[in-house]
Amino acid sequence: MDADFIRELFAEFGDVHIRRMFGGAGLYAGAVMFGLVSDDLIYLKADEETAPAFERERCAPFTYTTKHGKRALMSYWRLPDRLYDDPTELALWARQALAAARKGAAKKPPSKARTRRKKS
């Protein structure tokens, strides 16, 4: 999916940064990833409060197959097709995705600094 198209699509939401990752791209507002692009589909971050709205729209969560052949489910849901033509409502959904991403990041414990082993 073209980066200019994504920026135009999210223009009413605000400045979106796109970072390539794992064959797709992450959608960022500042340092917070609130969405992703995979196989030309956009997915937005959801939590227990916002996931039901995606379910009502019959949207599926993002899944991938691990290196061990298991299917992994992530808390990103496919953007409803109708939002591609409604920038105002898309901006609302994007703000909710950003709030869910911030809430999820706040729940995570801070990462431990890696220590170097002493050579013997």
Protein language model annotation of sequence segments:
Residues 1-120:
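Charge-dense, helix-prone N-terminal extensions
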